[in-house]
């Protein structure tokens, strides 16, 4: 949803943005499902130095405000809520 929204904000139509998002997610999912390599090696294999994936990953993997911090907080919140719900 957010990726589609960003694509639209960059000038793509909804259909173009959503199609790119679907293919990106499908491609990434297929890579990890159909490979014996781990996620780090797969990432390294598709990342060209100075390329578009490299630039996107530099933002997403920033230790101060990147996805690691966001995913950690989200997973911890879900785990906490799961514990709360298991007591009901």
Predicted regions mapped to residue ranges:
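Anionic-ligand binding region
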Residues: 1-18
């Amino acid at each position: 949803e957010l990726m589609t929204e960003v694509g639209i904000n960059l000038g793509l139509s909804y259909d173009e943005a959503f199609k790119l998002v679907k293919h990106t997610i499908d491609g990434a999912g297929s890579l990890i499902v159909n490979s014996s390599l781990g996620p780090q090696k797969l990432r390294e294999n598709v990342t060209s130095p100075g390329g578009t994936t490299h630039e996107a990953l530099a933002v997403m993997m920033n230790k101060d405000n990147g996805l690691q911090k966001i995913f950690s907080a989200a997973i911890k919140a879900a785990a906490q809520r799961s514990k709360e719900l298991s007591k009901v």
